[in-house]
């Protein structure tokens, strides 16, 4: 049931972002990368809280290391999008930062209550990001090696999230 809700919420959010950023690729990518870091920060926050409460599981250290690495990688993507003018407009920064604020706290609660479902949502988002970059490369700029590298990173993140879902059965 939660996976169905994840899919519907994701589809709705994607349709809004697609409409707002039609034809503005790097602004859209910047918003997506700004948002992409939020779940990993949320996961780390909850893992730290669980550790402080004595609720550490055997997978705890591995997950913390993976999520920290993912935040750094997503930050590199964000910086690339900034270098391409993705954050040039105040309205885009305003929209993304407010969306991140909401998304972060939703992920904190979601991860605390249902880590597998939280991972599933992030997994679906990473797959969407990979697909978004693949379409850009196919239809807009097939020679952008940085976008190609970012697309591969998104695929790797999706695989890591899938492994995390399996790990915490």
Predicted features and spans:
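Non-heme di-metal
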Residues: 1-169
